[in-house]
């Protein structure tokens, strides 16, 4: 019974243990057994500093403090009415927001949330912000403790600002001071944001006087290149032969791919790759028997018929200039070991063939053999040991990564026939040239010449692989052999080498390059401090790297950015992605993942866009957008720039007058555009025949297509999409597309038209579409000098004067110091002269900093932190509660309805003195709901009630 009574006593006394712990300075959890059933409470014994050694064991004697310790000092009867010495009211959790979190000082504890809020409030009102300044910087939003969104500090409303002013102040003076306060608040936020981000690359590219000019010129170069490609396609009829309809998706994709190949520097010969069937679906299928494909590859390599063609690169996928991926951060375990096993056999065979073909070696070749014998022996030893140790690993890797084996097998089988035919066709016209060149050389037979030529072509084409894989070449002994075989024909057969070099160029020209297809990696996390040069330096170690694109930072992501790294199509993108995931930049995990190819490149828009009335409206909108964007980047401004009349006409066209389209722009797409903007209707005929539009409004009319208008619109839509990266039917712009993996990836086209459409639907659609395109229709005008002056613009000479004063220090009488150089002068005027003469670059930096800041202020769409939710939208009940302080959302309930006995000496009956309305006086004990009953709410507080 003792154990059961003890357990019952423990449960009864510890019923409110969790509530008491937050009121006391020390924890009273030593009453819990250490070895109890609750696993989470096992560590409580280690937290109690007052527990003795006896309590460490489960059965030892435990210190049991008297239960009266929880009640404070003094004796207290166990039974009877508690009177006014009640325990505190039940404490609600702070995150509920509707309970009283104040601690009762009787229990010796305090609430950290309450005191922290009071300290912040007291310091903000009486020390740093006593002159009605700004609130302490609060970067979190109201709702949320877990939100990562950055916001500005909450600004005081008029009522809160009035509490900080003198009582005798007039209304006009209050309004003037409050206006100044809001202006200063905005200036401070802009200045803080500028100081926080001025050293980041994305910010410099926007506003720095030097970096922004370079970036704008780079973008203008991209646009000029796109314009040249578009004009080339417009002249050869490629643009006019396609309609921007979803039914012509293949033709649209071909036009976009043609643009990409041209932008990448491709030729008309490279465009032939668009006629070939795509082989990607075959590449990504996993073979059931991977070892069989390897055997087939070895058969094709060992066959004597294929000696000429087996060393050629694959024309459909790999060009002669491309290099395979070199292993990154891998010593022995590489994903491409199976490729090395395949590539080692043809290299050795080629070396043997070249040795047999060279029947008359010269003295120089013998000397070179002697010098390279050591390298060959050492490399052969290394390769033999490495091959024997990693043979089992290679078999496993071949079974796992058999995609590349299947790719090589199928591509080589398909490409062998084409290569044989190409070599036969080329050897026939070139044979007389070879005879003419080698007419004087009678010692070598022709069959030997052809054999040497074959070896020369093979070695030349394989040289990129050798140079791109230095790690693999050191493990295998093939590199020295191949290098030796390359040098043999170059010593004795100089004339033959020259002839074969010309032939090799012709072979390369005949191979179309799929420049429109790339592989890419998506970087989910890029810190704002990471620069483009750092990413490029990291990616340049990987073979096949092309470019990198970095998006603008977003405030929702705490100014973190996203990035896309583009590589050639034939690289092992998964291995590169694995290598990037093992690296960190500035202690930032980039989160690299493989970027998939685009699934749907042509996406349908509303079919009502094919209606004649909608098409005419779209032509007008497209012309406006093209004019604004052309002038923004000065694409067609070379000729009319010197003519004041044309410049004046351009200004009128920007203001929206449609009569100027095509007359002032040198853009051929906009020539004579006004002829298609004038509506035509048979109004007289309808009036004479008594036709009305009532039936059309109720039943609707069928879609009317005007092919001439549609052809004009399609030319404008493709111009916006190719040149300015504006997808008109998606009313959006694809930014930094020239640096993205897909330069012309997605386009929206007209979808299937509906059967009938009403006039109301047409008008609503036109109005809605014009609203969505407003960002392109309105011209972005920088702020004037007067406007940026109100925002806190700086003056260059004033800042230079401040810089001089800051670097002029008086040490003693007639003794002044310049901190920049450490020299001492007799007067400040000498320091000024010294700074302007010897530290002119520092003065120029100050002037650039001023221009940097003013450029940021001039941008009407400048990035900045969003307003605090408490500033723009405040709760209606905040003023009624008489609390909050205006600096941050209250983390605790108002001061009214406090439990009996609460009264910190500092706070008294109000909130920090006269600046806040006094709190309601404390209510008597009867309002703590000890007894439940009804009474008149309007009655006095001390009215008689039943006890």
Curated annotation (Swiss-Prot):
Residues 8-33, 40-49, 285-308, 345-366, 393-427, 478-493 have a biased composition (Basic and acidic residues). Residues 330-341 have a biased composition (Acidic residues). It is found in: Nucleus. GO terms for cellular component: nuclear body; nucleoplasm. Residues 1-100, 285-493, 643-666, 855-890 are annotated as: Disordered. Residues 465-477, 647-666 have a biased composition (Polar residues). The modification Phosphoserine is found at residues 81, 303, 330, 354, 357, 431, 646. Residues 367-376 have a biased composition (Basic residues). InterPro entries: SE/Ars2, SERRATE/Ars2_C, SERRATE/Ars2_N. The keyword Cytoplasm does not apply. The modification Phosphotyrosine is found at residue 79. Acts as a mediator between the cap-binding complex (CBC) and RNA-mediated gene silencing (RNAi). Involved in innate immunity via the short interfering RNAs (siRNAs) processing machinery by restricting the viral RNA production. Also involved microRNA (miRNA)-mediated silencing by contributing to the stability and delivery of primary miRNA transcripts to the primary miRNA processing complex containing drosha and pasha. Belongs to the ARS2 family. Interacts with cbp20, Dcr-2 and pasha. This is Serrate RNA effector molecule homolog.
